[in-house]
Every structure is written in C-alpha cells, then in structure tokens.
C-alpha cells in the first residue's frame, strides 16, 4: 500500500464562495490518491500578539498549530489584496510560526497558488507568501508556478473547473504530489 500524505490547504480568502476556495476544492478533487487535501480554516484566528502568547494562547491558535503539525505538507491558495498577502493569511502564517523556535511550518513541503480576477493572477501575493516560506524553512515547489488570473473565467456556470483550466491544475497537483513525496523523505 502506498503512502498517503495529508496536506493542509490554507485558503487566504474568508469568503465561503471565493474563487480561491473554489480552486482549493477543485485541487482536492484532482489530487492523486497519494494526497489527502483538507482545508484548514483561518477565519477564527485572533490577531497574533506575543503578550497573549505569554499569558494564555487562545484555543484556536493551539488547534490551528496542531492541524498544521499533523499535516505532511501545506498548500497555500491565496488572493491578492493591494499587491500583497491578505491580512488573514499573513496572520495565520504568523500564528503557525510561534512561539519562536516552535514553528508548526518548519520542514513541511509546500506550494502556492494565487487566484485573482486581475490579469496578473495574484503575482504579488504569491511571491510575498513565498518570501515568508523561505524564512519558515518550508521547501517550496518552484515549478510549475500557479498564477491564475481572470478568476471568473476559470469555472463553468455549474461551478466546476472549465476544460481550459483543469489540465493545468491537474499537472500542478500531480507535480505537487511528487514534490511532497521527495521532500517528506528528507
């Protein structure tokens, strides 16, 4: 029996029907049997504050960190707000990285998908997330890069991926499965 890797999917949009959440769901459906993708919610995480960490960390922080620690890999799916990372995603990254020296992210293979209505597909957010991941010691898949622009055009009226988008995301998630296997062995 082959290894099944658990992948925490962190979506940087809080909207229930955001394009990013739709792409995350589609990736879950397209994932090969070696990956089990699960969206980890970030909307209930209080803003990170080291004073609170020292006094009594919120249960939501503990639960989030535990979910990340239990995962074998992490997939970030993010929109772009003002050419950068949405505040909720940056907060989740910060919460998972603390207390200092006890990061839940360390060593976890990762990849970033950015989804935007704009033409450049969230390029700024994608790279801002990657910059944090380098510091957090997360081996990040470099290719294929995933900048999905024109988000409304990625889906059919039914909400499913269209025939133009599906092959790219299939290739992406297949490559990510190989990346996870390669980097979890290290």
Curated annotation (Swiss-Prot):
Its EC number is 1.6.5.2, 1.6.-.-. The keyword Zinc does not apply. Binds 1 FMN per subunit. It holds the Pfam family FMN_red. GO terms for cellular component: cytosol. Optimum pH is 5 for chromate reductase activity. Induction: Induced by H(2)O(2). Induced by both chromate and the stationary phase. The keyword NADP applies. It is an enzyme of class 1 (oxidoreductase). Disruption phenotype: Cells lacking this gene are inhibited by chromate to a greater extent than the wild-type. InterPro entries: Flavoprotein-like_sf (IPR029039), FMN_Rdtase-like_dom (IPR005025), NAD(P)H-dep_reductase (IPR050712). May be inhibited by divalent cations. It catalyses: a quinone + NADH + H(+) = a quinol + NAD(+); a quinone + NADPH + H(+) = a quinol + NADP(+); Cr(6+) + 2 NADH + O2 = Cr(3+) + superoxide + 2 NAD(+) + 2 H(+); Cr(6+) + 2 NADPH + O2 = Cr(3+) + superoxide + 2 NADP(+) + 2 H(+). One of its GO terms (molecular function) is FMN binding. Keywords: Flavoprotein, FMN, NAD, NADP, Oxidoreductase. Optimum temperature is 70 degrees Celsius for chromate reductase activity. FMN binds at residues 13-20, 80-83, 116. Its cofactor is FMN. Catalyzes the reduction of quinones. Acts by simultaneous two-electron transfer, avoiding formation of highly reactive semiquinone intermediates and producing quinols that promote tolerance of H(2)O(2). Quinone reduction is probably the primary biological role of ChrR. Can also reduce toxic chromate to insoluble and less toxic Cr(3+). Catalyzes the transfer of three electrons to Cr(6+) producing Cr(3+) and one electron to molecular oxygen. This reaction produces transiently a minimal amount of the toxic Cr(5+) species and reactive oxygen species (ROS). Homotetramer. Dimer of dimers. The tetrameric configuration has a central role in chromate reductase activity. Belongs to the SsuE family. This is Quinone reductase. It comes from Pseudomonas putida (strain ATCC 47054 / DSM 6125 / CFBP 8728 / NCIMB 11950 / KT2440). The lineage of its organism: Bacteria, Pseudomonadati, Pseudomonadota, Gammaproteobacteria, Pseudomonadales.
């Amino acid at each position: 029996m082959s290894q099944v890797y658990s992948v925490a999917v962190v979506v940087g949009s809080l909207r229930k029907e955001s394009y990013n959440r739709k792409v995350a769901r589609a990736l879950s459906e397209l994932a090969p049997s070696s990956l089990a993708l699960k969206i980890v919610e970030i909307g209930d995480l209080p803003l990170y504050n080291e004073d609170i960490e020292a006094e009594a960390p919120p249960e939501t922080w503990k639960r989030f960190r535990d979910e990340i620690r239990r995962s074998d890999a992490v997939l970030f799916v993010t929109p772009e707000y003002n050419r950068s990372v949405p505040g909720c995603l940056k907060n989740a990254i910060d919460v998972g990285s603390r207390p200092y020296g006890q990061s839940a992210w360390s060593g976890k293979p990762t990849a970033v998908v950015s989804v935007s209505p704009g033409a450049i597909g969230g390029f700024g957010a994608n790279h801002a997330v990657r910059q944090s991941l380098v510091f957090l010691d997360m081996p990040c898949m470099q290719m294929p890069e995933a900048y999905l622009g024109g988000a409304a055009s990625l889906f059919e009226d039914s909400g499913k991926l269209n025939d133009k988008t599906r092959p790219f995301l299939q290739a992406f998630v297949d490559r990510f499965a190989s990346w996870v296997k390669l980097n979890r062995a290290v």
